[in-house]
């Protein structure tokens, strides 16, 4: 049994399989999952686990070179937006419309569905390399 790092075996496998520029999505409970994209559902109850808890856990195990957010988060979910910026630190953020975000999610290797129930609490994480 693993004793540290990502304990969720499905998420751990996806992260291990990522290549440079591959993408995953961390999503709130309501984001639609496109047909053909793997859904890893970790939602337990409304709010559990939170989007930010999952983002922090994934970030600890993943080399991230870019983040994409729906631009609507800047107005409609300012608190989560601020916290996302704090978690990702100096990783570049690209903003797109929510409709563009949903279209981009079709390219993701997986979508991790959280229990988050605040608007636009979704991000696309682009894999980097550690060398």
UniProtKB/Swiss-Prot annotation:
Q: Which InterPro entries match?
A: D-ribose_pyranase (IPR023064), RbsD-like_sf (IPR023750), RbsD_FucU (IPR007721)
Q: Which residues form the signal peptide?
A: none
The protein's matches in NCBIfam families, at most eight in alphabetical order, are given as: PRK11797.1
Q: Mind telling me what this protein is named?
A: D-ribose pyranase
Name the protein family.
Belongs to the RbsD / FucU family. RbsD subfamily.
Known Gene3D superfamilies for this protein?
RbsD-like domain
The gene is rbsD
Q: Where in the cell is it found?
A: Cytoplasm
The Gene Ontology CC terms held by the record are: cytosol
